[in-house]
A protein has these predicted regions:
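N-proximal low-complexity "stem/linker" segments adjacent to membrane-targeting elements
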Residues: 1-25
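Short, acidic, metal-binding catalytic loop of nucleotide-sugar glycosyltransferases
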Residues: 24-33
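A conserved acidic beta->alpha catalytic loop
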Residues: 40-49, 64, 93
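Acidic donor-binding/catalytic loop of UDP-sugar-dependent glycosyltransferases
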Residues: 46, 96-109
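Flexible acidic/His/Gly-enriched loops in nucleotide-sugar-dependent glycosyltransferase catalytic domains
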Residues: 62-79, 103-163, 214-215, 232-233, ...
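Short aromatic/hydrophobic "clamp" motif used to bind/position activated sugar donors
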Residues: 89
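Hydrophobic/aromatic residue at the end of a short beta strand that borders the catalytic acidic motif
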Residues: 92, 98-102, 156, 178
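Conserved nucleotide-sugar donor-binding catalytic segment
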Residues: 139-217
């Protein structure tokens, strides 16, 4: 196999409970030419002490955490990217894990298809002692809202990350996280939305996530959906793409009228 250098960018904030398991999932990869860069977002727990036990890990310490988690996450990955040297960029949240063959499998996919500039693998949802595999959802990418796997399933070539980051980093959509922004960019600008039909990432779901205020059809869910539509509308405007007010858009605005 061609010895392609890989950068795994890890965004961490107060995740000492899972951080060691996360790092070890990279250290134990069957593919070896990997650098690990961890951006710690002013953690108040023992995250830094745990990271310092490892050799050959680049640590970026952010002194001041911002108000919105979505902006903090984008900042973390961008700062980590600027320190990286890999040809292929893997994103990983610090409570998630890679299967030990993930990097090797993904690199093989890039080598087999030279036109690929990005891909998503499929997650395994991990909640307490239960695991749930997500099935292939390739067909859904034809919809207005593409199916977007979690953050830690995203992989892309270095040059694409650089081109993309400044075109998705609008700091006035606080409920719109980086995975959604990346998905919209790849679908409508790059037109390169490839899902690798293998479950290679353990995506951890906490009780807080299960009990989230963003439950389907809750008022918070409709408000965030409206913000997602506004993000897409602004994104289309910035990139000279015609925005069509489809049924979903009209329904979302209708529901938000009654829950204000």
């Amino acid at each position: 196999m061609k010895d392609i250098k890989v950068s795994v960018l890890i965004a961490n904030y107060n995740n000492e409970k899972y951080l060691i398991e996360c790092i070890n999932s990279i250290k134990k990869q069957t593919y070896q030419n990997v650098e690990i860069i961890i951006h710690d977002d002013s953690s108040s727990d023992n995250s830094i002490k745990r990271i310092n036990k490892y050799k050959n890990i680049i640590i970026i310490k952010n002194r001041k955490r911002g108000k919105y988690g979505s902006y903090n996450q984008m900042n973390a990955y961008y700062r980590a990217y600027k320190k990286s040297k890999g040809e292929i960029i893997f994103l990983l949240d610090s409570d998630d894990l890679f299967k030990k063959n993930k990097i090797k499998t993904v690199i093989n996919a890039f080598l087999k298809n030279k036109k690929l500039s990005s891909l998503f693998d499929l997650p395994i949802y991990k909640y307490k002692n239960s695991l749930k595999l997500v099935k292939n959802k390739k067909k859904i990418i034809s919809n207005f809202w593409p199916y977007i796997p979690p953050q830690s399933c995203i992989v892309m070539k270095r040059e694409l990350f650089q081109k993309m980051i400044n075109r998705i980093n609008f700091n006035f959509f606080p409920d719109i996280w980086m995975d959604f922004r990346i998905g919209i960019y790849l679908k409508y600008i790059k037109k390169d939305f490839y899902i690798l039909n293998q479950n290679l990432t353990y995506y951890r779901q906490s009780q807080e996530m299960i009990s989230s205020n963003f439950k389907f059809s809750s008022s918070a869910w409709w408000k965030r959906r409206k913000q997602a539509h506004h993000y897409v509308k602004y994104f289309f405007f910035k990139n000279n793409i015609q925005h069509v007010k489809n049924l979903d858009y009209l329904l979302t605005n209708f529901m938000n009228y009654f829950i204000r």
